[in-house]
Amino acid sequence: MIARILDGRTCAEKVKARVKENIRLLQEKGLPSPGLAVILVGNDPASATYVAHKERACQAVGIRSTVYRMPNTITESELASKIDECNRDSNTHGILLQLPLPAHIDPANLLERIRPDKDVDGFHPYNLGRLVQRRPALRPCTPYGVMTLLTETHENLEGKHAVIVGASNIVGRPMALELLLAKCTVTVCHRFTRDLAEHVKSAELLIVAIGKPGIIQSEWIKPGAIVIDVGFSRLSPNKIAGDIDFETAKERASWITPVPGGVGPMTVATLLENTLQAAQTFL
């Protein structure tokens, strides 16, 4: 068995085309384009690259993006003031606080300070609570991007055993909520999980989000499973790896995402979708 490839780039282009068309329709009605404020703290090269990619994606679909670049020495209270300013700005429909932040700043306090209706990353307790209550509003970008990508398989997910490896607030936990909404039976594995291999072997849908290349051995993968690799590690300037060895895993899976070109483009596309959704609540 050779897996079919879940191409995140192709799926993301479909999402972006829909967003672009909806923005065009807004403009035809004389309404302003959605506005996104991105707050970037410090000089982390990876964060700067991600933000530049988001800027280009916004420009391509017609979203106005403004990047506020803050020094690494900024205090938590100063950063909170910038968020408050964006909250008040009627031309800003979405706010994104680029993570990670410097060690002296608590991200939880600042993410909670963003207005829930401008929280296009979907991390505010209000938006996560809506997801828990099965009444989603703005949804976390990577998990919802994965759900959109899964529609490309045309597989019925109801009743499937989904195993998530990784329990972060950004991916693992909201991913479990999304899969419960899709009527999957969900197992979440984390650093204290015993017999990880046995859990993985039972997965009809496997989603791995750890950031450790090779943490999942290909022989653990159930033949015919759908495999989503959210992991992203830069091994060298020209080499990027996921959490699973793609070449061997594709011989067991029915569908598999590549790294890069799988989940990453969907995260950005979902951010654009969320920004449009946030703008539509104001316009």
Curated annotation (Swiss-Prot):
GO biological process terms held by the UniProt record: L-histidine biosynthetic process; methionine biosynthetic process; purine nucleotide biosynthetic process; tetrahydrofolate interconversion
GO terms under cellular component: cytosol
Catalytic activity: (6R)-5,10-methylene-5,6,7,8-tetrahydrofolate + NADP(+) = (6R)-5,10-methenyltetrahydrofolate + NADPH; (6R)-5,10-methenyltetrahydrofolate + H2O = (6R)-10-formyltetrahydrofolate + H(+)
Entry EC number(s): 1.5.1.5, 3.5.4.9
Coiled coil ranges: none
Gene that this sequence comes from: folD
Function description: Catalyzes the oxidation of 5,10-methylenetetrahydrofolate to 5,10-methenyltetrahydrofolate and then the hydrolysis of 5,10-methenyltetrahydrofolate to 10-formyltetrahydrofolate.
Quaternary context: Homodimer.
Protein name, entry field: Bifunctional protein FolD
Keyword field: Amino-acid biosynthesis, Histidine biosynthesis, Hydrolase, Methionine biosynthesis, Multifunctional enzyme, NADP, One-carbon metabolism, Oxidoreductase, Purine biosynthesis
Binding site for NADP(+): 166-168
Keyword Phosphoprotein applies: no
Family: Belongs to the tetrahydrofolate dehydrogenase/cyclohydrolase family.
One GO MF term: methylenetetrahydrofolate dehydrogenase (NADP+) activity
Superkingdom of origin organism: Bacteria
Pathway(s) the chain acts in: One-carbon metabolism; tetrahydrofolate interconversion
